[in-house]
A protein has these predicted regions:
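Amphipathic alpha-helical dimerization/coiled-coil segments
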Residues: 2-21, 38-43, 80, 90-121
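N-terminal helix-turn-helix DNA-binding core of bacterial DNA-binding proteins
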Residues: 20-59, 81-93
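Conserved acidic functional residues
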Residues: 30, 66, 99
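Sequence-pattern detector for short linear motifs
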Residues: 36, 63, 71-74, 88, ...
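Short linear functional motifs in flexible/disordered or boundary regions
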Residues: 48-49, 66, 106
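Canonical helix-turn-helix DNA-binding module
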Residues: 52-75
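Short, Lys/Arg-enriched C-terminal cap helix and immediately downstream tail that follows
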Residues: 75-76, 83
Length: 121
């Protein structure tokens, strides 16, 4: 049995200082990505969840794209646990760089069409 456990592999993301407002706004311009971030803020309570937890009925390649855009904008942190990608909102970094942005996401009303598709709760 190994004396230590290797840390999960963290996927590339910008530092808080490297987060760029146009990139963040572009990431949030898609209602599915906005709904993903909203769901993590509301239902994950700052914790980590697998990408499949979101429960979006879309092809895996589409979900991978949406999560990658959110991660590359600096909104989500992702790491690998085996074959599973685990994500969490980078609350502290986003609040530091763009104060009030996550409050706007929390206040956003998820469109009924997305709710019917099971995209957000």
């Amino acid at each position: 049995m190994p004396a230590h456990v290797d840390a999960p592999e963290r996927l590339p993301q910008p530092s808080a200082a490297e987060m760029d407002l146009p990139v963040v706004m572009d990431a949030l311009s898609d209602p599915i990505r906005l709904a993903i971030l909203h769901r993590y803020l509301v239902d994950a309570a700052g914790g980590e969840r697998s990408c499949g937890w979101v429960g979006i009925d879309r092809p895996k390649s589409t979900l991978t794209h949406h999560f990658r855009v959110l991660r590359e904008a600096g909104l989500l942190e992702q790491h690998l646990e085996g074959l599973t990608r685990v994500s969490r909102v980078r609350v502290e970094d986003v609040q530091q760089r763009f104060p009030g942005l996550l409050d706007l996401v929390l206040d956003w009303q998820v469109p009924a069409a997305l709710l019917r598709e099971g995209i957000a709760s």
